[in-house]
A protein has these predicted regions:
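Acidic, glycine-rich loop-and-beta core segments that form the ion-binding/anion-interacting portion
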Residues: 34-81
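Glycine-rich anion-binding loops of enzyme active sites
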Residues: 1-54, 193
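Glycine-/charge-enriched secondary-structure boundary and capping motifs
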Residues: 7-14, 66-84, 88-204
């Protein structure tokens, strides 16, 4: 990992790893089951999650000269509250869908953003077509983009932009998947669809 300002001389980083077992029937993605028209469902992030902190620190502290207790414009939060928002867990709303075989793929949106993470779960014959009007980029990300001089294409490849997880469901199951997510108080929405392509992400 590259985390400027975190690894100080004489300090060490201790990392933990979890190894698990999954039933073969539950493995995702199911590439052979994916087809044009399958629905992309977005789940919101709670903030930066684990990516974009070097940019955020540069913008907030170096460029804008903000303190941790200063308000972060447009967010209704302090800089500390916005940047230290806990990476939310998607286990509770998503695992029942996995166990019920309601999904054909899912992508955790980490470093690389939507542009790089979704293709990891796509066959080479399909593209993920993202409807950019389906959600509003949260104020935190808009602030970082504006003050950091980050264009939308670069932002899509560096930040989650408010989308923390993307689920892929068959078209005839998408409504039921959305209903289950909403019943679990998950504010999910239709983010886009799969179209013929080469395993990339396209924005509309």
């Amino acid at each position: 990992a590259e985390m400027p300002g975190v690894y100080a001389e004489g300090e060490v980083d201790v990392a933990g790893t979890i190894v698990g077992v999954v039933d073969e029937a539950d493995l995702l993605p199911r590439l052979e089951a994916m087809a044009e028209g399958d629905v992309l469902i977005g789940l919101p992030s709670s903030g930066l999650h684990t990516n974009g902190y070097s940019l955020a620190r540069k913008v907030c502290f170096d460029l804008e000269k903000l303190g941790v207790n200063d308000p972060l414009p447009g967010t209704g939060k302090t800089v500390a509250e916005a940047l230290l928002a806990i990476h939310r867990s998607y286990l509770a709303p998503v695992m029942p869908l996995v166990k019920a075989h309601q999904l054909v793929a899912m992508a955790h949106i980490t470093g690389g953003g939507l542009t790089d993470n979704i293709p990891r779960v796509l066959p080479k014959t399909l593209d993920a077509e993202i409807d950019t009007a389906s959600w509003q980029i949260p104020a935190l990300f808009r602030f970082l983009m504006e003050k950091g001089g980050l264009g939308i294409e670069d932002a899509r490849q560096a930040l989650n932009l408010g989308v923390g997880m993307v689920l892929v469901a068959k078209a005839d199951r998408a409504e039921a998947v959305l209903a289950a997510l909403h019943a679990a108080e998950e504010p999910a929405w239709v983010l886009g669809r799969l179209v013929a392509g080469t395993g990339s992400v396209v924005y509309r």
